[in-house]
Amino acid sequence: MLIPSKLSRPVRLEHTVVRERLLAKLSGASNYRLALITSPAGYGKTTLISQWAAGKTELGWYSLDEGDNQPERFASYLIAAIQQATGGHCASSEVMAQKRQYASLSSLFAQLFIELAAWPRPLFLVIDDYHLITNPVIHEAMRFFLRHQPDHLTLVVLSRNLPQLGIANLRVREQLLEIGSQQLAFTHQEARQFFDCRLSQPIEPAQSNRLCDDVAGWATALQLIALSARQNTGAVHQSARRLAGINASHLSDYLVDEVLNNVDNDTRQFLLKSALLRSMNDALIARVTGEENGQMRLEEIERQGLFLQRMDDSGEWFSYHPLFGSFLRQRCQWELSTELPDIHRAAAESWMAQGFPSEAIHHALAAGDASMLRDILLNHAWGLFNHSELTLLEQSLKALPWESLLANPRLVLLQAWLMQSQHRYSEVNTLLARAEQEMKGEMDDTLHGEFNALRAQVAINDGDPDEAERLAMVALETLPLANFYSRIVATSVHGEVLHCKGDLTKSLSVMQQTELMARRHDVWHYALWSLIQQSEILFAQGFLQAAWETQEKAFTLIQEQHLEQLPLHEFLLRIRAQLLWAWARLDEAEACARTGMTVLANYQPQQQLQCLALLVQCSLARGDLDNARSHLNRLENLLGNGHYHSDWVSNADKVRVIYWQMTGDKAAAAAWLRQTPKPAFANNHFLQSQWRNIARVQILLGDYEPAEMVLEELNENARSLRLMSDINRNLLLLNQLYWNAGRKSDAQRVLMEALTLANRTGFISHFVIEGEAMAQQLRQLLQLNTLPEIEQHRAQRILRDINQHHRHKFAHFDENFVNKLLNHPEVPELIRTSPLTQREWQVLGLIYSGYSNDQIAGELDVAATTIKTHIRNLYQKLGVAHRQDAVQHAQQLLKMMGYGV
């Protein structure tokens, strides 16, 4: 829950000097990306901008305090300020901020700018007291903000020092409007206006000018002079002399003498106690100070000119001027040290009564009251956890003694979930085991169930499905239906275990159940996770269209619940890319993989390994080995600098092995095979993948017998588990094995079976990557004219893709082929009497394969003009005039030689 006063622009006070000269300068603020107002405390920055903001409706105001160094809190308030300015225009960004569904502040701002692009009018965002920000993460995010904000948005920053926002670049590009302390200092005329408003008896202009000069136009000093004059008519010159040359850091003594010592004791106590509140209203004041009518007291303090300012139009919220508030808090530490814990406790109770647990925790920590902190956490910790207030929770739990956690085991559970969210899996089990061992009395079944549900999640994350299954089932047996979150966790783990064990039908059913439970209780990340799992299961079963439709549901969920920046979004994009790749929609597959990498841009580079493997895979399917090698270099560097789950390693190894096959790199393949552990089983599609990698290398090395044993066993397991997509892949590897071993009839048999199964899976690229050997076999099958119609269309599509993408297509026109062609009894007489050179045959092969002139020049490493000469010569020899005629001529020659094209 956001504190309204932090989003309220300060109310324009009576008796303030209107700074016409500065307002005139600010009138052109919409022409700049940044308006920067900097000066030491007390120069009137906030007052000036509140005057300028008066009457502007499309303006958001965000007043900072020290707690805003938490990036999540900063994001929530900043987006709320934008929403205030736009009347709720940026709904997606607001939901993402509220639910902490973004990878970083920069990525959240990127989403914000997408929404603001449709905003039609100038817009302003004021951030006050930016000097309180010390977190470099926020500084970096705001630099991103300034680089990418839309042109119609102006950021207005108020700070006591020069902020780390990269302003030099903005200054050079004339996108920065600056107002500093010299400009903020009062002029003689403004000082006279100020005294005329504040003093009952006017002072002479010369005297006013001298006072202004004595304090160098410092507004706070002028206010203190006026305050002293009201309290003691003879104090004007004395105050001016004391304040001359003084700065904000040496004001304490002056404020004690001239302010605190000149008010009655009740007012002094009120000031000191109320200053502990970063913002205050009637109820807070009444509870903290004991005043019966807090609102009336605040208005009285305001009338006395004691540096109190209204924070909203309703006049409900107040705060002290930062300079004065800081001074009062310091004095409170000295003068009321024994009462401080009680004051903070009262503040915490009042904040709790108004529904602000985060502020209450701040005061409970300051009071050192572990019991109060414990009670707040017991009532509100899970709400804070679900809103990702993780830093605050961690700080709070550390402040509680271990005995207090033991006495309230749900706080132990909370601490364990915090560790789980930070991937500190081993610490989770250690913490829970220690708690169970040291806890006094029996744990009830519900708590046991919650502990076991969390342990089950840790076990599956840590690659221990057997232990995960045991714990999940025990949890489900003991957890009541009301403990929906832990039941969702345990059910999800159960479904994932079934998936790992190859029981896809049951796993699909359990994951559908998980989705329903998660949707019912708005646990959206588990709903998304269950949809991703369902899609993977359907893919493994060979139902790729159903997998596609499930992915569509997941993308809709992401859009509706604004989950775009969760890492799970990358997972969904990745499995969509895998499906698109299988269907030979390579450009779309690559786009999904790159979007996935963008989602993970703010995480460790190792997280991008799987998407990077997909980029390699797309390049391999296109036959672009140079690009594949470039991506592989980065992939292998990541592999060597991280620890990965076996599934990730298997996917990375797959593209490496295919690359070695395409390039004939037997040495690299053999080295990999020597050091790669062989999985103990092949009872799911993850393990099947790594065994296929091993078999592919064995085939490349000519070790056909062990490769055949592997593939036969894989198929046996896959058939028993109905892993139809794996059967399709295994058949293609068997085809390669039989073809290379000279077992042509076996090769044809399994190829036809693979083509038939592809009617269900839709596979294209899995055939294409096998290259020329696959092309030769498909030509022969098409020439036999025995394929059913659907398989025939698929074979033609695969052959077309091989011809389009793979760079060894012109091998049809190598020297041996040309010799056989010239000796063929049906060779056209024109070719026999006017034969093409070997280079011209190569060019014809590349024209037939769909290469442009520039691509042919690149392939043969000659100039484009040379290629044009070759083409002109071969056209003349073939008696053709156009490129398409040459393609048809080449096709006829290939058909004559027995190639079905």
UniProtKB/Swiss-Prot annotation:
A GO MF term: DNA binding
Top-rank taxon, per record: Bacteria
InterPro entries named in the record: P-loop_NTPase, Sig_transdc_resp-reg_C-effctor, TPR-like_helical_dom_sf, TPR_MalT, Tscrpt_reg_HTH_MalT, Tscrpt_reg_LuxR_C, WH-like_DNA-bd_sf
Alphabetized SUPFAM superfamilies for the sequence: C-terminal effector domain of the bipartite response regulators, P-loop containing nucleoside triphosphate hydrolases, TPR-like
Activity regulation annotation text: Activated by ATP and maltotriose, which are both required for DNA binding.
Biological-process GO terms, alphabetical: positive regulation of carbohydrate metabolic process; positive regulation of DNA-templated transcription
PANTHER family referenced in this protein's UniProt entry, alphabetically: DNA-BINDING TRANSCRIPTIONAL ACTIVATOR DEVR_DOSR (PTHR44688:SF16)
Protein name: HTH-type transcriptional regulator MalT
Upper lineage: Bacteria, Pseudomonadati, Pseudomonadota, Gammaproteobacteria, Enterobacterales
